[in-house]
Amino acid sequence: MTIWINEQIDPSGLLYSCIACCNETQAQNCHASFEQNLTAEQKASGWVARLRTVNSWDEVPVNALKLD
């Protein structure tokens, strides 16, 4: 099973927000939203939106919003 994880990470590397789901289209849409919601100032200071995959719910960060 592929699980898609969307993360917003602050300049110090801390996870600011995280949403996980099994639907690739939903994950891509979420990632686009995460990217659009970062301001130019945030991006310049090192904020990033990251989309990655894992194979198990055990690999999803504990504070993630998990969508089935």
List PLM regions with ranges.
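Generic structural motif
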Residues: 11, 24, 54-57
